[in-house]
């Protein structure tokens, strides 16, 4: 792995990110070889990813390095079923409130 890397959004988490990135790069190089047994593949970096992710999420809960609405990003870019359900529920609630106020 080269010395060049993308830093974490939070400097306190950078070391964890570099450890995870190194692990994933090594794993991925094996994963793409023709002889790798994909059906038995276990992600050896999952625990490292979880630790790094927790570090970032803890800081995001208290710090906002950018003016970003994470919920809006999740909705617009991930567009999960959960997001769609919340939208439907919010629309139904808004419609119900509008009907009550116009009566």
From Swiss-Prot:
Residues 91-103 have a biased composition (Polar residues). Keywords: Disulfide bond. A motif (Cx9C motif 1) lies at residues 13-23. Coiled coil: none annotated. Residues 80-103 are annotated as: Disordered. The keyword Cell membrane does not apply. Disulfide bonds join 13-55, 23-45. InterPro entries: MDM35_apoptosis. A motif (Cx9C motif 2) lies at residues 45-55. PROSITE patterns: CHCH (PS51808). Residues 10-63 form the CHCH domain. Residues 80-90 have a biased composition (Basic and acidic residues). Pfam families: UPF0203. Belongs to the TRIAP1/MDM35 family. This is Uncharacterized protein mdmh-35.
């Amino acid at each position: 792995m080269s010395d060049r890397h993308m830093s974490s959004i939070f400097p306190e988490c950078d070391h964890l990110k570099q450890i995870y990135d190194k692990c994933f790069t090594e794993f991925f190089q094996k994963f793409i070889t023709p002889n790798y047994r994909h059906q038995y593949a276990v992600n050896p970096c999952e625990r490292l990813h979880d630790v790094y992710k927790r570090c970032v999420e803890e800081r995001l809960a208290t710090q906002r390095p950018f003016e970003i609405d994470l919920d809006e990003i999740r909705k617009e870019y991930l567009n999960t079923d959960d997001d769609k359900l919340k939208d439907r529920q919010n629309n139904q609630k808004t419609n119900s409130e509008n009907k009550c106020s116009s009566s």
